[in-house]
């Protein structure tokens, strides 16, 4: 059992039988009345973010989780197969339990979050930034840049993102996997 004084970002909680991890929290001590903690919690299963307020000092069930590095091997329909490099143990994760799945390619290292007591896989997260190759994009027209102009590009994983006009087919780009946005061109 943990109290609100133990809260930290990334901590996993069990609320009403569902697992959430803390995205953001703020201890508030108003001038009048008792202190409380305002939090933003992200559901492990659905990815939905909720806001919840706790009274200061309340005991909450903390869930012990472990983050383990796995190598992405291949995709079989909606199931993704991973292997741990040290033990060569293979596990699989369903597509809807992988954060940033549209930017995952074979050979990428992925963090899989596991419940420490029951060894069940909760979800998988790919790194925040991924370097991917553009396989198709329309050529940019010079002089067509009145504002911050972008165009649609298809990357090697099959996902489509918006990129600046100077990006061409075959260029390597860095993509933010949290929101699917272009970060920079990689040489």
Curated annotation (Swiss-Prot):
GO cellular component: cytoplasm
One MF term in the entry's GO annotations: translation elongation factor activity
A biological process term (GO) from this entry: peptide biosynthetic process
InterPro entries xref list: Elong-fact-P_C, NA-bd_OB-fold, Rib_uL2_dom2, Transl_elong_fac_P/YeiP, Transl_elong_KOW-like, Transl_elong_P/YeiP_cen, Transl_elong_P/YeiP_CS, Transl_elongation_fac_P
Keywords in alphabetical order: Cytoplasm, Elongation factor, Protein biosynthesis
Alphabetical list of SMART domains matching this protein: EFP (SM01185), Elong-fact-P_C (SM00841)
PANTHER family reported in the protein's UniProt record: ELONGATION FACTOR P (PTHR30053), ELONGATION FACTOR P (EF-P) FAMILY PROTEIN (PTHR30053:SF12)
Record-given protein name: Elongation factor P
Chain's gene name: efp
